[in-house]
């Protein structure tokens, strides 16, 4: 049996894997146990009551967290004309059409989010094999294919998170950094849960949000008691 590291021993002693913690207690635990030499992200895993094998029950979308994610996001936009000027004014680092596609084909991918206006998808479509595996392919379901590219850029910069359930029906995303105030992490989590509820497939039966766990980049998951969250989120 592998020997537990000192860090993992401390986590096991502090975190009761069978308990659901009040959100404030859960955040305090994460802050106490975050001892990495960098500012860890706070990640969330939400177990949904869906059948992930059925396409009509899959959950996918995006929402802007009220306090952002703490990450600096570089945005590339495929568009032209007045939209190109609007995208630049909104803060996009890279804006173009065929010229931007050529950069990407050469492996120049210094960006975190790709946005496209509908008329640019003929160009973006050639990049599916490059952008797709990295989760960067623009998609109207998450607001990254849109005629209003300026708004999409602002959302990305403001701390928009994208979510999509995995094959087990679990959503994994981030809600901030461990050095955020506890109230900000709580409000970000509540905003995410509200967005997930709005995205509930009509075919999903029974309990929809079954379990919510939060963790830091290097830490263990802490289950959250949903009763301690705002009424709109639980």
UniProtKB/Swiss-Prot annotation:
Query: Which organism does this sequence originate in?
Result: Salmonella arizonae (strain ATCC BAA-731 / CDC346-86 / RSK2980)
**Its family?**
Belongs to the universal ribosomal protein uL1 family.
Keyword list, A-Z: Repressor, Ribonucleoprotein, Ribosomal protein, RNA-binding, rRNA-binding, Translation regulation, tRNA-binding
Look up the domain of life of the source: Bacteria
**NCBIfam families from the UniProt entry:** rplA_bact
Q: Does the keyword NADP apply?
A: no
Q: Where are the transmembrane segments?
A: none
Q: What is this protein called?
A: Large ribosomal subunit protein uL1
**Keyword presence, tRNA-binding:** yes
What's a GO biological-process term for it?
translation
Gene Ontology cellular component terms for the protein in this record: cytosolic large ribosomal subunit
Subunit structure, interactors included: Part of the 50S ribosomal subunit.
Role played: Binds directly to 23S rRNA. The L1 stalk is quite mobile in the ribosome, and is involved in E site tRNA release.
Question: What GO molecular function annotation could you give as one example from this UniProt entry?
Answer: rRNA binding
One Pfam family, short name: Ribosomal_L1
């Amino acid at each position: 049996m592998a020997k537990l590291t000192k860090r993992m021993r401390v986590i096991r002693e502090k975190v009761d894997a069978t308990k659901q913690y009040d959100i404030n207690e859960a955040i305090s635990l994460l802050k106490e146990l975050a001892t990495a030499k960098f500012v860890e992200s706070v990640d969330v895993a939400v177990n949904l009551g869906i059948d992930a094998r059925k396409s009509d029950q899959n959950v996918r979308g995006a929402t802007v967290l009220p306090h952002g994610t703490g990450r600096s996001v570089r945005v590339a936009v495929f568009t032209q004309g007045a939209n190109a000027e609007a995208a630049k004014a909104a803060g996009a680092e890279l804006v173009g059409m065929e010229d931007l596609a050529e950069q990407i084909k050469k492996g120049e991918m210094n960006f975190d989010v790709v946005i496209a206006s509908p008329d640019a998808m003929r160009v973006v479509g050639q990049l599916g094999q490059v952008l797709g595996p990295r989760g960067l392919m623009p998609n109207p379901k998450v607001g990254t294919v849109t005629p209003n590219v300026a708004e999409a850029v602002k959302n990305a910069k403001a701390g928009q998170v994208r979510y999509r359930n995995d094959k087990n029906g679990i959503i994994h995303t981030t809600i901030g950094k461990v050095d955020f105030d506890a109230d900000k992490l709580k409000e970000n989590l509540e905003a995410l849960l509200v967005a997930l509820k709005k995205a509930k497939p009509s075919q999903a039966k029974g309990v929809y949000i079954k379990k919510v766990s939060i963790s830091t980049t290097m830490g263990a998951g802490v289950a959250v008691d949903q009763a301690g969250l705002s009424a709109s989120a639980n």
